[in-house]
A protein has these predicted regions:
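Divalent-cation
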Residues: 2
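P-loop NTPase catalytic phosphate-binding loop
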Residues: 5-17, 25, 30, 35-161
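Short, intrinsically disordered, charge-balanced linker/junction segments flanking boundaries
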Residues: 163-166
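Surface-exposed substrate-engagement region within the catalytic domains
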Residues: 20
């Protein structure tokens, strides 16, 4: 059925959602290979797909201080996270980017284990490159916080506000 959002929060408009009876699959290759993504000047470009007008939809992760991904089972959370990771892998060199991946299901991010030596950061005590043991998540996040504080101290000493100014 049709869903009406009236009014759209923060805007003086009404939204009408009409289900697409003929949905089209948008391949990752088509958006990653698009001119818009390839020539993007964003610091951390993320491409998620295409808009209803068939334009490549992308944004700069640097402009988003926080991201919350939530939804019911089967609604595309993992697809969205994989699109974010893939976008960054295509645009950044391993010297510029490291991921800390937590995967309690043990199957969502296992495909990224092959990039362990290049893009995955892990705790000094070793272990798997993708954290699947929920008892190690707090220790891992604490280590990330220590690294974050160290970097903030470096920014402070350099009298800059962000890594781009550094």
């Amino acid at each position: 059925g049709i869903r009406i959002i009236a009014p759209i929060p923060g805007k003086g408009t009404i939204g009408i959602e009409v289900p697409n009876k003929n949905p089209k699959i948008v391949s990752g290759q088509s958006v990653i290979g698009s001119k818009k993504f390839q020539e993007s000047k964003y610091d951390l470009p993320i491409v998620l797909g295409k808009t209803i007008t068939n334009e490549v939809f992308m944004f700069d992760l640097c402009k988003m201080p926080h991201v919350l991904v939530a939804g019911a089972t089967g609604q595309g959370k993992s697809v969205g996270l994989n699109a974010i990771i893939t976008s960054l892998l295509y645009k950044k060199h391993p010297a510029e980017l490291k991921f800390v991946l937590v995967d309690p299901k043990k199957v969502e991010f296992s495909i990224y284990s092959v990039i362990e030596n290049h893009f995955l950061a892990k705790l000094p005590d070793g272990g798997e490159p993708i954290i699947t043991d929920v008892t190690k998540v707090v220790q891992t996040l604490n280590s990330v916080c220590v690294e974050m504080d160290t970097r903030y101290d470096l920014l402070k000493m350099a009298h800059v506000r962000n890594i781009k100014e550094y």
